[in-house]
């Protein structure tokens, strides 16, 4: 299963400016907030979680919320993705991979789940 998402970085910047920490905590864990050094990274994390939920075929919903999807980085800075235990079980996930890119004011993410 493959999911992709694109988001304008400015959109995430505006939401963060308007709602501050409440906005961040709606879709990120404390560890993810600590990793996100700028709005481009925040937008990439948003796109990654949306792409993952699309790969599962449910979108962000009761079946898979933002906080069921966890983004981290490898020692070399590459993005990594994990899911909550219930998501692994409910969707029979064996492996997942994530790619995030930023260009022209956009963040794009692709997630592959097997």
UniProtKB/Swiss-Prot annotation:
Cofactor(s) annotated in UniProt: Mg(2+)
Q: Catalyses which reaction? A: apo-[ACP] + CoA = holo-[ACP] + adenosine 3',5'-bisphosphate + H(+)
Residues bound to Mg(2+) are: 5, 50
Where can this protein be found? Cytoplasm
Q: GO molecular function of the protein, one example?
A: holo-[acyl-carrier-protein] synthase activity
Q: List the disulfide bonds.
A: none
Q: Does the keyword Magnesium apply?
A: yes
Q: Which GO terms describe its biological process?
A: fatty acid biosynthetic process
- Listed InterPro entries: 4-PPantetheinyl_Trfase_dom, 4-PPantetheinyl_Trfase_dom_sf, ACPS, Ppantetheine-prot_Trfase_dom
Could you list this entry's UniProt keywords, alphabetically sorted.
Cytoplasm, Fatty acid biosynthesis, Fatty acid metabolism, Lipid biosynthesis, Lipid metabolism, Magnesium, Metal-binding, Transferase
Enzyme Commission number: 2.7.8.7
Question: What Pfam families has UniProt attached to this entry?
Answer: ACPS
| UniProt KW Magnesium keyword | yes
Cellular component GO terms held in the UniProt record: cytoplasm
HAMAP family, per database record: AcpS (MF_00101)
The protein's role, per its UniProt record: Transfers the 4'-phosphopantetheine moiety from coenzyme A to a Ser of acyl-carrier-protein.
**Similarity field:** Belongs to the P-Pant transferase superfamily. AcpS family.
**Full protein name:** Holo-[acyl-carrier-protein] synthase
**The encoding gene:** acpS
């Amino acid at each position: 299963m493959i999911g992709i998402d694109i988001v304008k970085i400015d959109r995430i910047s505006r939401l963060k400016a308007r709602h501050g920490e409440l906005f961040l905590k709606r879709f990120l864990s404390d560890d993810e907030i600590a990793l996100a050094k700028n709005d481009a990274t925040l937008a990439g994390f948003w796109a990654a979680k949306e792409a993952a939920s699309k790969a599962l075929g449910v979108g962000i919903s009761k079946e898979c919320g933002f906080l069921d999807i966890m983004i981290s980085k490898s020692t070399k800075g590459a993005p990594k993705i994990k899911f909550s235990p219930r998501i692994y079980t409910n969707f029979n996930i064996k492996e997942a991979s994530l790619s995030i890119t930023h260009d022209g004011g956009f963040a794009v993410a692709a997630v592959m789940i097997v």
